[in-house]
Regions:
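Rhodanese-like catalytic fold shared by cysteine-dependent sulfurtransferases
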Residues: 2-57, 68-69, 80-214
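Compositionally biased, charge-rich low-complexity tracts
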Residues: 63-64
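Structural scaffold elements adjacent to functional motifs in cytosolic proteins
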Residues: 74-76
Length: 214
């Protein structure tokens, strides 16, 4: 059991460090961002809010204004290659890119994921830090599970969450709040697939109709 835990931790840390190394120096001066008071999380209207819980004020369209804050952490909840068929709903199973400064922490490594669209199918179903039971409670699979989660999502920081379409980010916020995090410090920024800002780090390139991933 301890060996499995070490492997799981190593996988998460390797993805975080390996993918985002070198992307933590932001272009321009973001010092003023730290001094600004953040608006409280507010759910968007319509399907973006009702289904995904994407924030009304801090989302794909505005996140550039809130990057580089020393009082915040930035987490992208996607997998490098998701077993789910996200192409079936207009997305990308591969991590085709990310917003500069966001660290990749795949939700399916943290807890089991259910309720995905039928066309997408199943995502990763291996070992996880937590298991969500039939009652919606998150049960730690290891003694160290909570300690690891608190290291990834510091409770004294604002937490900005993103993913491909907004679903994994919303599920992550639900999990954290259920486990004792302050919901007023967690923002579901929404969908990378809808992001058109100035801090996009491209991983996917299409050449002569073929997709390539750096």
């Amino acid at each position: 059991m301890k060996k499995v835990l070490i492997i799981s931790i190593t996988a998460i840390i390797s993805i975080i460090v390996g993918l985002t190394a070198g992307y933590f120096i932001f272009k321009g001066d973001t010092t003023n961002n730290v001094e600004e008071t953040l608006p409280k999380p507010e759910i968007s209207e319509g399907i973006r809010g009702e289904q995904f819980g994407i924030d009304k004020n801090i989302n794909e369209s505005t996140i550039d204004e809130y990057l580089g804050r020393s009082d915040s952490v930035y987490r992208d909840m996607r997998m490098l290659k998701d077993p789910g068929n996200y192409e079936a709903i207009g997305g990308d199973s591969y991590l085709s890119g990310f917003v500069e400064g966001f660290e990749v922490v795949p939700l399916p490594y943290l807890t089991n994921v259910t309720g995905l669209p039928e066309d997408v199918g199943e995502t990763y179903t291996g070992d996880t830090l937590f298991t969500q039971d039939d009652s919606g409670n998150y049960v730690a699979n290891y003694e160290e599970s909570m300690e690891i989660l608190e290291a990834i999502f510091p409770k004294d920081k604002n937490i900005f969450l993103m993913c491909g379409g907004g679903g994994y980010a919303g599920m992550t916020k639900t999990m954290l709040v259920s486990l004792g995090w302050d919901e007023n410090k967690i923002y579901n920024v929404g969908a990378y697939w809808s992001y058109n800002g100035n801090n996009k780090v491209e991983v996917k390139k299409t050449i002569d109709g073929e997709d390539y991933y750096n």
